[in-house]
Swiss-Prot record:
Main location: cytoplasm
Protein name per its UniProtKB record: Cytidylate kinase
Organism: Streptococcus pyogenes serotype M18 (strain MGAS8232)
EC number: 2.7.4.25
Taxonomic lineage: Bacteria, Bacillati, Bacillota, Bacilli, Lactobacillales
GO cellular component, one term: cytosol
Keywords on record: ATP-binding, Cytoplasm, Kinase, Nucleotide-binding, Transferase
BP GO terms, sorted: nucleobase-containing small molecule interconversion; pyrimidine nucleotide metabolic process
Superkingdom per UniProt: Bacteria
Length: 226
């Protein structure tokens, strides 16, 4: 049976990572968390105090401490920078609020997109991000673009933070998500937008199971036809 490439894009907290992980497990595919890669680069910049004028230093640190993914005992995915487990560190609010400017740096995107494409070559992979269908995997057999209201996405992020023990204010989260939407969709390099051949799905009020079912049925149909 042919293994396809699945690209899931959308704004912050639209449910991309959650559904991508479930579908990858259901189909036996590899899940690549591209957002974690950009967050890792952001973590490096913040930890060392690097600015957008010091891209070479960020890339140097990425080379010395490459990004890797490992599975935890419970099946969850751990993110490492070299030997350092940064799984929780890259989800902190300071990283979330700075990832847009780091991910907009052309040199950072070029390096990480190169890594992502190399991993995806064999197929049987599902990636989520903001430019997977448009830039990283324009040849993906299935492209999905998830959207949801700012209110709902803020609610999701608030609940996620509670579960991780991260303090946050709901109204502040709404403002931050709206601001990030603007930054991501207006950046010069790989702006957030749906690929022309992507299926746009509004997840507002839709359960995770409902979104998973929609995407998985589309994927299985493509595989059956190939």
């Amino acid at each position: 049976m042919k293994a396809i490439k699945i690209a899931i894009d959308g704004p912050a907290s639209s449910g991309k990572s959650t559904v991508a992980k479930i579908i990858a497990k259901n189909l036996g595919y590899t899940y690549l968390d591209t957002g974690a890669m950009y967050r890792s680069a952001t973590y490096i910049a913040l930890t060392h105090g690097y600015t957008d004028k010091e891209v070479a230093l960020i890339l140097e640190e990425l080379e010395k401490n490459p990004i890797s993914f490992k599975k935890a005992k419970g099946g969850s995915q751990l993110v490492f920078l070299g030997d350092e487990d940064v799984t929780l560190a890259i989800r902190q609010n300071d990283v979330t609020n700075n990832v847009s400017w780091v991910s907009a740096l052309p040199e950072i995107r070029e390096e990480l997109v190169h890594q992502q494409r190399r991993i995806a070559q064999a197929g049987g992979i599902i990636m989520d991000g903001r430019d997977i269908g448009t830039v990283v995997l324009p040849d993906a057999e299935l492209k999905i673009f998830l959207v949801a209201s700012v209110e709902e996405r803020a609610e999701r992020r608030y609940k996620e933070n509670l579960e991780k023990g991260i303090e946050s204010d709901f109204e502040t989260l709404k403002e931050e998500i709206a601001a990030r939407d603007y930054k991501d969709s207006h950046r010069k390099v790989s702006p957030l937008k749906a690929a022309e051949d992507a299926l746009i799905f509004d997840t507002t009020g839709v359960s995770i199971d409902g979104v998973v079912q929609f995407i998985q049925e589309k994927a299985e149909k493509i595989v059956d036809m190939s």
